[in-house]
Amino acid sequence: MFEGSITALVTPFADDRIDEVALHDLVEWQIEEGSFGLVPCGTTGESPTLSKSEHEQVVEITIKTANGRVPVIAGAGSNSTAEAIAFVRHAQNAGADGVLIVSPYYNKPTQEGIYQHFKAIDAASTIPIIVYNIPGRSAIEIHVETLARIFEDCPNVKGVKDATGNLLRPSLERMACGEDFNLLTGEDGTALGYMAHGGHGCISVTANVAPALCADFQQACLNGDFAAALKLQDRLMPLHRALFLETNPAGAKYALQRLGRMRGDLRLPLVTISPSFQEEIDDAMRHAGILL
């Protein structure tokens, strides 16, 4: 079971190419700071604007650099079932510990279509699958009943990344799927409540910028020390908010640039975060104690 603070990695660019050195260094820093796991090529990794070869390159660099020290859950989603299967096969051949599969975006399939999508991917996989429910990006929500059906019929499906922000979901999903279902939130701001509802961890954007604090927060939750977790949440909450003032990962990349970790380059149609919001991110990083 995946647990704790699992970083949804940004993809560093330099001159519109993958910055391999910056990606390697980011992975090393994440592991040194205590992150429990890594997710390359998800939403935060700008996967929609990566070519197939770039997608594979990012996954391979992350796995090679991590070298088994922490699990790597490779983003392998697509609105094309066939393409998602190809990404899954690449990830398992590259040595990924699991794959993250987003609900099909743009196509707007029915609940039956969602079920068949995951069933086909499951049949092609030999490693754990985490279902990624993010209706704000995909325009469809995976119903709890559909999720339970997928879990029951697809032996490689082990859990969910829930990015709905709805704190009813973890309890409903646990009741529908059972205690062995891996509950991961994708919303940093509500992670404390999610963990109190029985969650196991967070696939986190903020952990790109504050990996040690996010790891400590998750460890406190896993230990049942919610008083300590609340203190850390109060340090992190302004940063959770500020990083999403404009479309993710613009805020996270700006923050990493301010920390000297990489360039802040984004790929169109995403653009650099507005100057007024940059100031808010700076203030939030100072509040968290990660920027002087």
Swiss-Prot record:
<dbReference type="GO" id="GO:0009089">
    <property type="term" value="P:lysine biosynthetic process via diaminopimelate"/>
</dbReference>
<keyword id="KW-0028">Amino-acid biosynthesis</keyword>
<comment type="function">
    <text>Catalyzes the condensation of (S)-aspartate-beta-semialdehyde [(S)-ASA] and pyruvate to 4-hydroxy-tetrahydrodipicolinate (HTPA).</text>
</comment>
<comment type="similarity">
    <text>Belongs to the DapA family.</text>
</comment>
<dbReference type="InterPro" id="IPR005263">
    <property type="entry name" value="DapA"/>
</dbReference>
<dbReference type="GO" id="GO:0005829">
    <property type="term" value="C:cytosol"/>
</dbReference>
<keyword id="KW-0220">Diaminopimelate biosynthesis</keyword>
<dbReference type="GO" id="GO:0019877">
    <property type="term" value="P:diaminopimelate biosynthetic process"/>
</dbReference>
<keyword id="KW-0456">Lyase</keyword>
<dbReference type="InterPro" id="IPR013785">
    <property type="entry name" value="Aldolase_TIM"/>
</dbReference>
<feature type="active site" description="Schiff-base intermediate with substrate">
    <location>
        <position position="161"/>
    </location>
</feature>
<feature type="binding site">
    <location>
        <position position="44"/>
    </location>
    <ligand>
        <name>pyruvate</name>
    </ligand>
</feature>
<keyword id="KW-0963">Cytoplasm</keyword>
<keyword id="KW-0614">Plasmid</keyword>
<dbReference type="InterPro" id="IPR020624">
    <property type="entry name" value="Schiff_base-form_aldolases_CS"/>
</dbReference>
<dbReference type="InterPro" id="IPR002220">
    <property type="entry name" value="DapA-like"/>
</dbReference>
<dbReference type="InterPro" id="IPR020625">
    <property type="entry name" value="Schiff_base-form_aldolases_AS"/>
</dbReference>
<comment type="subunit">
    <text>Homotetramer.</text>
</comment>
<comment type="pathway">
    <text>Amino-acid biosynthesis; L-lysine biosynthesis via DAP pathway; (S)-tetrahydrodipicolinate from L-aspartate: step 3/4.</text>
</comment>
<protein>
    <recommendedName>
        <fullName>4-hydroxy-tetrahydrodipicolinate synthase</fullName>
        <ecNumber>4.3.3.7</ecNumber>
    </recommendedName>
</protein>
<feature type="site" description="Part of a proton relay during catalysis">
    <location>
        <position position="106"/>
    </location>
</feature>
<feature type="active site" description="Proton donor/acceptor">
    <location>
        <position position="132"/>
    </location>
</feature>
<keyword id="KW-0457">Lysine biosynthesis</keyword>
<feature type="binding site">
    <location>
        <position position="203"/>
    </location>
    <ligand>
        <name>pyruvate</name>
    </ligand>
</feature>
<keyword id="KW-0021">Allosteric enzyme</keyword>
<dbReference type="GO" id="GO:0008840">
    <property type="term" value="F:4-hydroxy-tetrahydrodipicolinate synthase activity"/>
</dbReference>
<dbReference type="Pfam" id="PF00701">
    <property type="entry name" value="DHDPS"/>
</dbReference>
<keyword id="KW-0704">Schiff base</keyword>
<feature type="site" description="Part of a proton relay during catalysis">
    <location>
        <position position="43"/>
    </location>
</feature>
